Amino acid sequence: MYETKAIMTTDVVVVNPDTPLDQVVDLLVAHDITGIPVVDHENRLVGIVTEKNILGALSVQEGICGTAEAFMTRDVVSFDENDDVIAICECLVNNHFRRVPILSHGKLVGIISRRDLIRYILEPIGTRRVVHHTVRH
């Protein structure tokens, strides 16, 4: 019913393992996002830095110093671009994370967040409401 490729955000903000943590924070704030995938020089996913990781860094040190690699989550749940959207939805419902990276041949090609799924699922409902409203009046 729903295609992963149609739902995922393809213009993904990413960082490298050696990106300074203060720059990661700047990107989170500037793009109003809650997590940034960490990729290597071949665009392979090696981790993710989330707001939770940043708070963890702040709890053990004063200020924001270090690199993305030092504070990233290494075991990241990801999906292939051809995986079923229902499986992705179930994963986001049953786990604490808010987004999942989408891979193709092991390389990052997109990301799907809870917000992306809600927006995509509700879009047809909004269209039906407009049509229904127009027909009624």
Task: Describe every region a protein language model picked out.
Residues 2-12, 66-76:
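Bateman (tandem CBS) regulatory domains
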Residues 2, 19, 49, 66, ...:
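Short beta-to-alpha loop/turn elements within the nucleotide-binding domains of ABC transporters
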Residues 84, 107-137:
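Cytosolic regulatory modules rich in charged/polar residues
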Residues 8, 25, 46, 55, ...:
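Conserved protein kinase catalytic domain
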Residues 28-31, 36-52, 92, 100-116:
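A glycine-centered beta-loop-beta connector
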Residues 14-32, 39, 79-96, 103, ...:
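The conserved cystathionine-beta-synthase
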